[in-house]
Amino acid sequence: MTLATRTVTLPGGLQATLVHQPQADRAAALARVAAGSHHEPSRFPGLAHLLEHLLFYGGERYQDDDRLMGWVQRQGGSVNATTLARHSAFFFEVAADALADGVARLQEMLQAPLLLREDIQREVAVIDAEYRLIQQHEPSRREAAVRHAASAPAAFRRFQVGSADALAGDLAALQAALGDFHRTHYVARRMQLWLQGPQSLEALGELAARFAAGLAAGEAPPPAPPLRLGEFTALQLAVSSQPALWRCPLIALSDNVTLLREFLLDEAPGSLMAGLRQRRLAGDVALNWLYQDRHLGWLALVFASDRPEEVDRQITHWLQALQQTTPEQQQHYYQLSRRRFQALSPLDQLRQRAFGFAPGAPPAGFADFCAALQVAPSVSLACQTVSPGEPVATQGFSLPLSRWRRRPESDPALAFAFYPQAAGDLVAKCPEKAAPLLHLPSPGDPPRLLLRPPFYCSPDQAEGLARGEQLRPLLAALRHAGGHGEWHLFDGSWQLTLQLPEPGRRPEAILQAILRQLALPVASLTPSPESIAIRHLMAQLPERLGTSGHQKGWLAALAGGSAEDAQWVARQLSLITAPVNPPMPAPAPCRRGVERLVYPGGDTALLVFIPLPDGASLAALRLLAQHCEPLFFQRLRVEQQIGYVVSCRYQRVADRDGLLMALQSPDRRAGELLRCGKDFLRQLAPMDEATFRPLQQRLAAQIRASRPPEARALSALRQEYGLPELTPQAVDALRVAEVADLAREMTRRRRRWQVLFTTGD
């Protein structure tokens, strides 16, 4: 479905894009400013990044946890910002009826920030901690290596992240520079706004007009200086793990980039990625923007590979093959890109519109685009496990960077095939028997099948990744047939979701191949190491909580579709040799204790999972977590400056519900972080009715909001097997005393906690 969209230029020059999304229960806003790291004064590298942080302190009207960050957290929404080379962006998503209140807060923080000295000092410390983190962040190091190949403008090689050394000196001068930067760039003619929600275009237009009111017009942004590459554009970066090839061309901005991305991400038989995997040349691929100005883009095609020469040659063959695709094939992939975009949340759609890969006009001139891409100025970076040479200092990093001297290779070109293709002789017989299937009928909606291992029995990460590798080409083939499938880790448990095409296009052969694949054994794959300590702990937590052994079988639920659809799916499920929807044995108790995990780097990370006590109210836990989240952030991140990762929230992990505290700090020990978490819970003031009622109302609205089909299917399975699941009735019946009792119980019984931590080098 194409969403009604309108772009308007408001008095003063602000451009607003309004997107009407009927029946949506969420809404989003994104403001983009034409100012980033390349615009900051050379005296204060990192100033644009620092200003991004400071703007969240807001202005005079909204104070403390009523500012955008804390307010969105209390709404159960999401909020963030980013500083790029030539842009900064601020964005949030909330329930649709809260959009206007969020836009009012966004308006004030961007138009009239306080920029107080004590806030500046506080955020300089945070920026410095982030700088120390990013020193060991492998993706950031690799991006910096590519940017080093640019000879102009000089900002590409300049330090941009910010640090205490760069920013903490003359506080008065820094405050003045921040004010000057804000007055120059945060003006109507250098700002764009995107709003998306179920509101009418007229109502969204009124919101945009209110946002623009009071903005100084300012001057239009100057054109970007020409981007020129240096003498050496084939580079090699010595790495300890995760070898890769980065192929990074400079291209004129075009809607064809999104179409190229769809061809690139395809994993069906005949695709580039299927061929590379078959020859063991590459594992994964990603397409990212390194840089964008008004007319030019710098793309990064990133392949996980230890054979960069062979992959680079196959990319060239692939670009040649793309020039021969037919208009019908290009239209097919264009429609796939639209389906990929429409599946995103409102906020992610706006992010793609502002600086990503939102589909634009239908394909035009794609062959010429691919031909131009093949000869475009480009940087190649081979990340290889070789002995590091002399380091190169660039952008605040010390990188073992050298010239890449390619080895000769002569692999034959892959045989590429593009879709749609004739069905051929692929015919499948429908089984006669039917397996048990839990069905949530909704004849007007397409059937969505959820398959997952029995509760508390999810495979570990290595086995789950291997299963995903087996399913990749089949799920891609399903996508070309009009369906969609995804094998992914959800709340610490692996699950498969399959959206099936309409009855006249049922791809029985593909579905049966997928189901048969589930019965085959898999060889474990070693997960890629996480680049941030707290993410490493999160990846390890599901296995640390324990499982109930390895019960064979699969749980299956179908959301949507008719009784006839359910009968057809149940017959297909009979092909699974393991039991479907088997009885569940009593779960093993949740593991507890304190464990240190080895992780390289200088930071300390702490993860505390406090499980919901047996028989306690899940509704009380959810409400308690909503209450704690902004208070925890305010106390430990803003007031105590513990570190840059500060989170306390409800989390389901490997089918167990609990309260999760996550902290990462460059200078605090694990014991100190744990003590901070304990003190927060011990000193949490008893909740009164005035605090309780708005939280209860918000939780009731969340549980009554429409949910994706796979979420409804999982909820039905949990209820079928007697696991805790949030219901509107439980939220309505909740009382403040239950929340207070639960808080005391979870705080007091600390021996039931599961604590994971890493310590710095």
UniProtKB/Swiss-Prot annotation:
Keywords: Hydrolase, Metal-binding, Metalloprotease, PQQ biosynthesis, Protease, Zinc. One of its GO terms (molecular function) is metalloendopeptidase activity. PROSITE patterns: INSULINASE. Pfam families: Peptidase_M16, PQQ_syn_pqqF_N_2, PqqF-like_C_4. InterPro entries: Metalloenz_LuxS/M16, Pept_M16_N, Pept_M16_Zn_BS, Peptidase_M16, PQQ_synth_PqqF, PqqF-like_C_4, PqqF_N_2. The active site is at 52 (proton acceptor). One of its GO terms (biological process) is pyrroloquinoline quinone biosynthetic process. Signal peptide: none annotated. Its cofactor is Zn(2+). Zn(2+) binds at residues 49, 53, 130. Its EC number is 3.4.24.-. Pathway: Cofactor biosynthesis; pyrroloquinoline quinone biosynthesis. Required for coenzyme pyrroloquinoline quinone (PQQ) biosynthesis. It is thought that this protein is a protease that cleaves peptides bond in a small peptide (gene pqqA), providing the glutamate and tyrosine residues which are necessary for the synthesis of PQQ. Belongs to the peptidase M16 family. This is Coenzyme PQQ synthesis protein F. The gene is pqqF.
